[in-house]
Structures are given as C-alpha cells and as structure tokens.
Amino acid sequence: MARSSKRGPFVANHLIREIRNLNIQKKRKLITTWSRASAIVPIMIGHTIAVHNGREHLPIYVTDRMVGHKLGEFVPTRNFRGHAKSDKGSRR
C-alpha cells in the first residue's frame, strides 16, 4: 500500500536536521547516510548525499527532477557481471 498523503513523505530526522543546518549556513558539503528509504524533498536540491549501497557510500547530486523519489532508487545494490560467454563444450 502507498503511504497516506496526509502523513507526508518519510525523511530520516538526522538527514532533515543536517540539511536545514547547511541551508542556514549556506554551505554545501557531502552528507553520508544509510537511509535509502528517505524521500527526496525540495530542501535537498543542490546538495550531494552519499547513500550506502551495502558496501560503500555513493555520492548523488540531488536535482529538481529527483524530488518525490527515494534516495535508494539512485544507488544500485546489485553488481551484474554478465552472462557466461558462449561455451559450446560445456553444453553437453
């Protein structure tokens, strides 16, 4: 089920607090977070947020087109190596 519109989007408290402090100081620095479920809200535009993918933090520059999406959507967690090459000897 989708989240109720009257409740608003989920954003981790530490993330909101840090972004608001940076906006007040008019600074832009890298913000690291493990909160992949946090939604991107308009106050995040212009910030770079490093989101954890299970192994490392990958930086994401937030633009206006990302508003409404989740942070985890922009960081892939799985590493696809490709299918095995055609090996006719292994078929039999």
Curated annotation (Swiss-Prot):
By sequence similarity, the record places it as follows:
Belongs to the universal ribosomal protein uS19 family.
Which organism does this sequence originate in?
Adiantum capillus-veneris (Maidenhair fern)
Predominantly, its location class is plastid
Q: Which Pfam family is one of those matched by this entry? A: Ribosomal_S19
Instruction: Give compartment(s).
Output: Plastid, Chloroplast
Give me any GO biological process, just one: translation
Q: Name one GO molecular function term.
A: structural constituent of ribosome
For this UniProt record, give its keywords in alphabetical order, as a comma-separated list.
Chloroplast, Plastid, Ribonucleoprotein, Ribosomal protein, RNA-binding, rRNA-binding
What is the superkingdom listed in this entry's lineage?
Answer: Eukaryota
Q: What is the lineage of its organism?
A: Eukaryota, Viridiplantae, Streptophyta, Embryophyta, Tracheophyta
Q: InterPro entries of this UniProt entry?
A: Ribosomal_uS19 (IPR002222), Ribosomal_uS19_bac-type (IPR005732), Ribosomal_uS19_CS (IPR020934), Ribosomal_uS19_SF (IPR023575)
Q: What does this protein do?
A: Protein S19 forms a complex with S13 that binds strongly to the 16S ribosomal RNA.
Q: What is this protein called?
A: Small ribosomal subunit protein uS19c
| Annotated GO CC locations | chloroplast; mitochondrial small ribosomal subunit
